[in-house]
Amino acid sequence: MAIPVVVVGCAGKMGREVVKAVHAAPDMAVVGAVDRSHIDEDAGELAGIGPIDVLVTDNLEITCAMVAQERAPGVMVDFTHPRGIYDRVRSAIAYGVRPVVGTTGLPPEHIEELAEFADKASTGCIVAPNFAIGMILLQQACLRAAEYFDHVEIIELHHNRKADAPSGTALATAQMIATTGKTFNVPEVSESELVAGARGGMTPGDIRIHSLRLPGLLAHQAVIFGGLGQSYTLRHDTTDRAAYMPGVLLAIRKVLGLKSLVYGLEKII
């Protein structure tokens, strides 16, 4: 039986990719499409795949209630703005619909509260700052490199319509490196910034992140390690949003077997 999937933000760039990917998956079906715009338009037409007989609505509650009547457990995929995501996830869980969230910029306290809510409801939920498999492999390689290098900085580059900085992926990468427990980037000179912020933002793990926002970019990240007489650069480039879809489809399948919130795609690979 096909997994019923609701796509929130279906009119956005990521939402349209999700509609296409889910519709093409043999074990899934788009049964709901939610957005603030393009009401009553066919979600398939918006995604460029032709009509799929699913009309866009702005009412998530009614959509989740409808999905709850399906014989198979439903999943909500949300790649929208962080504003309101907390309430949307709670609404989905209340109806037994499993959320898969790719929205970045969620405050840690909201993630903790959602984890408690999912635990009490014994309902699976996946929140991930990045769904690109290549990025997950990069982060895992960073842990290995961090064993041998004492200096590291992160440069993340995104399109100029990305609202949050640094990216959730860059923050997650810094946090992952910091779990090694090492002290990184001990200064060897007394630094002074001639322009405020020139050295980037410092994370709690003493790892600097530099954020670039430019037209012509999509999503890119470089993690640069430095040591005596050498540097080591790990880089991942996303040139098309289709890169996220294998991870999204994996999360949709995996969330059905969970009873709590999982943060990070690396936890289910």
Curated annotation (Swiss-Prot):
One Pfam family matching this protein = DapB_C
What EC class does the entry list? oxidoreductase
Give the domain of life: Bacteria
Binding of (S)-2,3,4,5-tetrahydrodipicolinate occurs at: 159, 168-169
Question: Where in the cell?
Answer: Cytoplasm
The molecular function terms of the Gene Ontology recorded here are:
4-hydroxy-tetrahydrodipicolinate reductase; NAD binding; NADP binding; oxidoreductase activity, acting on CH or CH2 groups, NAD or NADP as acceptor
Q: Which InterPro entries match?
A: DapB_C, DapB_N, DapB_N_CS, DHDPR_bac, NAD(P)-bd_dom_sf
Matching CDD domains, A to Z?
DHDPR_N
Binding annotation for NAD(+): 9-14, 35, 102-104, 128-131
Give GO cellular component annotations, separated by semicolons. cytosol
Q: What is its EC number?
A: 1.17.1.8
Q: Which reaction does it catalyse?
A: (S)-2,3,4,5-tetrahydrodipicolinate + NAD(+) + H2O = (2S,4S)-4-hydroxy-2,3,4,5-tetrahydrodipicolinate + NADH + H(+); (S)-2,3,4,5-tetrahydrodipicolinate + NADP(+) + H2O = (2S,4S)-4-hydroxy-2,3,4,5-tetrahydrodipicolinate + NADPH + H(+)
Q: Which residues form the active site?
A: 158 (proton donor/acceptor), 162 (proton donor)
Q: Kindly state which keywords UniProt assigns to this record, in alphabetical order.
A: Amino-acid biosynthesis, Cytoplasm, Diaminopimelate biosynthesis, Lysine biosynthesis, NAD, NADP, Oxidoreductase
Question: Which NCBIfam families does UniProt cross-reference here?
Answer: dapB
Known role = Catalyzes the conversion of 4-hydroxy-tetrahydrodipicolinate (HTPA) to tetrahydrodipicolinate.
Listed name of the protein: 4-hydroxy-tetrahydrodipicolinate reductase
